[in-house]
A protein has these predicted regions:
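Metal/cofactor-centered catalytic core regions of large enzymes
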Residues: 1-404
């Protein structure tokens, strides 16, 4: 076998017993969950090497941020991880608020936590349904998307959009939630734990599903740390780390929850960790509903935060502020900041550099899927080709995060 640009190519001679085969998986393949191309070097059905080839979904979104006012970047963040959009909004807003020295009101912080956990549930439901379908359990896919539809309707009620929500703002929220919103959230989480039990009954005790995952895709704690893996895959490798608890933001220090951890380090552990994470998210949402404070949802910073429509109609000063923010943006003090959060797929981070103008000089997005994909070969080397589908599903990557 010869090497060409770091990739193996087949020689003309065929039939040698030690000859490995090189095949493509993707970029059009249902199990890659996006336009991911994997060049696989295999010996029979045993995986020898994996060469991920990314870039098919490249959008240049980081460069686009440099041409936008700070507030205009928020809709772009939705489109990076389109399965967990509110976490993207939250991370970016927190980063810019750090640069501005701005603190969102307490009520806005609690609503942010509530919606971030709903967004986490949305992400985990998509993962569980598609992962189970990859293994052959179609029923679970239909059930999880049933509950996901309920969450999307909640997003639509509060933000007007089902997926690309763009609801968080620098300094607070776009608008007050509808009057019945919290009641609708309460009605959802009242029955959702039973749905999690239903998923568990269908999968956890299923010998076929268990055998496809148990002992497959081993990723040790040392390898996970060395490769920069975060989120559920890291905790399933025995590393007890969660930014919500260990480096709290947006008021998470006021909430009581457990961080699910497993030391089994395999696909089965990653499945169980995410299943338990959904239960903990329900507890956080319930605490947010029970302790929701009163007060404003926007910081008192008229030159940064857009005024309410009522004020615009009655106060000339509010109308002027609105006009200047929309047409000129607002200057952010020169400096740089990194803000990380615990999103559904792992640690999401925004590194924002300001040169003192109304547009960011640089926005770098650190998303977990790029690091997690690096661990794929470590988890699959020496395993059967059929195990690759189970491993890809267990790490839950999003190609929008990888390519950007």
């Amino acid at each position: 076998m010869t090497e060409l640009a770091g990739m193996p190519v087949l020689e003309a001679a065929q039939g040698a017993k030690d000859q490995h085969m090189v095949i493509n998986m993707g970029p059009q393949h249902p199990a890659t969950h996006g336009v991911l191309r994997l060049v696989l070097e295999i010996d029979g059905e045993i995986i020898v090497r994996i060469y991920p080839k990314v870039g098919y979904l490249h959008t240049g979104i980081e460069k686009t941020c440099e041409a936008k006012f700070y507030q205009q970047v928020i809709p772009l963040t939705d489109r990076v991880n389109y399965l967990d959009p509110l976490s993207n909004n939250l991370c970016y807003c927190l980063a810019v608020e750090k640069l501005l020295g701005l603190q969102a009101p307490e009520k806005a912080e609690w609503i942010r936590v509530l919606l971030a956990e709903l967004s986490r549930l949305n992400s985990h439901l998509i993962w569980l349904g598609t992962h189970a379908m990859d293994i052959g359990a179609l029923t679970v896919f239909l059930y999880t998307f049933r509950e996901r539809e309920d969450i999307l309707r909640l997003f639509e009620a509060v933000a007007g959009q089902r997926m690309m929500t763009s609801y968080f703002r620098i300094g607070g929220l776009a608008m007050e939630p509808p009057l019945d919103f919290f009641d609708r959230v309460q009605a959802f989480i009242r029955t959702f734990p039973e749905k999690i039990d239903e998923y568990s009954n269908l999968l956890t005790g299923n010998p076929i599903f268990r055998n496809r995952l148990k002992g497959v895709g081993i990723l040790s704690a040392a390898d996970a740390i060395a490769l920069g893996v975060t989120g559920p895959p890291l905790r399933a490798s025995g590393v007890d780390f969660d930014l919500r608890r260990d480096m709290p933001y947006s008021g998470y220090e006021k909430f009581q929850f457990k961080v699910p951890v497993s030391t089994d380090c395999d696909c089965w552990a990653r499945y169980l960790v995410r299943l338990e994470e959904m239960r903990e998210s329900v507890k956080i949402i319930q605490q947010a509903l029970d302790g929701m404070p009163e007060g404003p949802i926007k910081a008192d910073a008229p030159k940064i935060v857009l005024p309410d429509r009522e004020k615009m109609k009655t106060q000339m000063e509010a109308l002027i502020h609105h006009f200047k923010i929309v047409t000129e943006g607002f200057a952010v003090p020169a400096g740089e900041v990194y803000q990380g959060i615990e999103a559904g797929h792992g640690q999401t981070g925004y590194y924002v550099v300001s040169d003192g103008t109304a547009k960011p000089y640089r926005v770098h997005m650190r998303y977990p899927s790029f690091a997690t994909l690096q661990a794929l070969e470590t988890m699959c080397k020496g395993r059967m080709l059929a195990d690759l589908v189970a491993v890809i599903g267990s790490i839950d990557i999003v190609l929008g995060e990888i390519d950007r």
